[in-house]
Amino acid sequence: MATIPLTRRGAEKLRDELARLKSVERHAVIQAISEARAQGDLSENAEYEAAKDKQGFIEGRILDIESKLAAAQIIDPSTLDAEGRVVFGSTVDLQEEESGAKVTYQIVGDDEADLKQGLISISSPIARALIGKSAGDVAEVNAPGGVKSYEVVGVRYV
């Protein structure tokens, strides 16, 4: 099994979700199934079918998270010594060359990505273009609207 890179924060977020699924969601869906069974004929019981579907989703998500955590390589960005290069976990200050717009992103695992929070997936086109770059380098990113150029203004490990 391949390792899955996660920041400490991302691993903690997955652990919290796993605990919630096991201690709250699983019990709630079992209760919903029990209540639906009490209504009688299961062959035409929409509540029962919905609860069983939800149970399948919850159990699948539990297995998914457990698998990811078992394969996780947890990386603490503050301990990185990447000599100013962009690596997994680093926070990158960028300036879009055409518009001059400035953005800051942290490169994180797929399950941690949240663009509104400035967290981009290691698998994203922009992260792949940035890996290995240093301050002053320009990254070319194939975006849906065409190729965009970003200058790396700074790289931090926080």
Question: Which residue ranges define each predicted feature?
Answer:
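Structured, basic alpha/beta domains of bacterial-type, RNA-associated proteins
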Residues: 59-79
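Helix-rich terminal scaffold detector
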Residues: 1-63, 158
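Residue-level signal for pocket-adjacent positions within structured domains
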Residues: 1, 16, 37, 43, ...
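Context-gated lysine
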Residues: 13, 22, 52-54, 68, ...
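Non-DNA-binding regulatory cores of transcription-related proteins
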Residues: 75-158
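Conserved NTP-handling cores and scaffolds of large molecular machines
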Residues: 18, 22-25, 40, 69-73, ...
